[in-house]
Regions:
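Cyclic-dinucleotide signaling modules
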Residues: 11-14, 34-36, 61, 65, ...
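Short, intrinsically disordered, charge-balanced linker/junction segments flanking boundaries
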Residues: 3, 7-8, 12, 31, ...
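Residue-level "micro-hotspots" composed of small/polar
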Residues: 2, 39-49, 86-90, 122, ...
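Loop/turn residues immediately N-terminal
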Residues: 18-22, 67-70, 107-111, 155-159, ...
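Conserved beta-propeller blade signature
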Residues: 12-15, 60-63, 101-104, 149-153, ...
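Short loop/turn segments that connect beta-strands within beta-propeller blades
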Residues: 26-30, 73-77, 115-119, 163-167, ...
Length: 280
């Protein structure tokens, strides 16, 4: 199986696969139950290409697929397709923020926001001539920082955040002077507030507010490779950061990286001119 997502729900491990639907393992008994899409049977998952599985704050289980979004009904043991976002969207990531908004990231239609308190849906898409819109309709990852701001890593549009008060998106690097790459795979925040972001050009460290503290790490610094995998990251309870890539994964403690601010003095010990002998 091509496993794309894992979600632990008590004693049950939900496994989302590409082309194989969902497998749910009872970790106590080892029993496995399969959920697949069947065109002629109602209330099955909307596609066998399962890209993400997410458990909401109230216990709801959402399943993002290459053909839309559905929600698990534990009473009937089946799935309800959420028609509000349509069936032609590929849902790659789901996250519920601290303000009870469920964010749905898609690879072809921007992002959707669902207010779980009043059941209101909002659709945000990129518009070429409007800098207040999301930077790309191809969204890879969702991330909420410690202040409750939502961030979006995109495929080709770099990194942007959402201003909840102004209802607008803010591009992190509009002049292309900071980020070495516009493909953002995963985002984590360290104890000091800095972001660590994986991309197609290694991992870079940035301060989301002041935009300083920038450092880029590549394969020359010990990374498994310069290319990483979408949404493959983790911050442990100890504060360690994990990032998965195409050749394995890297783990590190961000606080152990200390910038050497000492500028050594320069001494000129020799001067050589081309095509001149020592006597000349």
């Amino acid at each position: 199986y091509d496993i794309r997502s894992l979600m632990l729900d008590g004693d049950y491990l939900w496994i989302g696969t590409y082309a194989g639907g969902i497998r749910v393992i009872n970790l106590r008994t080892g029993a496995v139950k399969a959920y697949t899409h069947s065109r002629g049977i109602p209330n099955t998952i909307c596609s066998n290409d399962v890209l993400c599985i997410y458990k909401g704050r109230k216990g709801e289980i959402y399943v993002g697929t290459s053909w839309g979004l559905c929600c698990y009904d534990p009473v009937r043991d089946n799935f309800m397709t959420i028609t509000s976002i349509g069936s032609m969207v590929s849902v790659v990531d789901i996250y519920e923020d601290m303000y009870n908004h469920l964010w749905i990231a898609t690879s072809n239609s921007g992002v959707f926001s669902y207010n779980t308190m009043n059941a209101h849906w909002k659709h945000y898409q990129h518009e070429r001539e409007d800098s207040t819109t999301i930077t790309s309709n191809s969204v890879i990852t969702l991330f909420e920082d410690t202040k409750g701001t939502m961030w979006f890593g995109t495929n080709g549009g770099g990194l942007c955040s959402f201003d909840a008060k102004e209802k607008r998106f803010i591009e992190f690097d509009p002049h292309n002077t900071l980020l070495p790459n516009k493909v953002i795979y995963a985002i984590e925040q360290d104890q000091g507030g800095d972001f660590w972001v994986s991309s197609n050009a290694g991992i870079f460290k940035i301060n989301p507010v002041t935009k300083d503290h920038f450092r880029q790490f590549t394969i020359n610094d010990g990374l498994q490779g310069n290319q990483f995998i979408a949404r493959s990251s983790l911050k442990s309870s100890e504060g360690k950061l994990y990032f998965g890539g195409i050749n394995g994964f890297n783990v590190f403690q961000p606080e152990q990286f200390v910038d050497n601010k000492y500028i050594p003095p320069v001494y000129v010990t020799d001067i050589r001119l081309p095509y001149q002998t020592d006597e000349q």
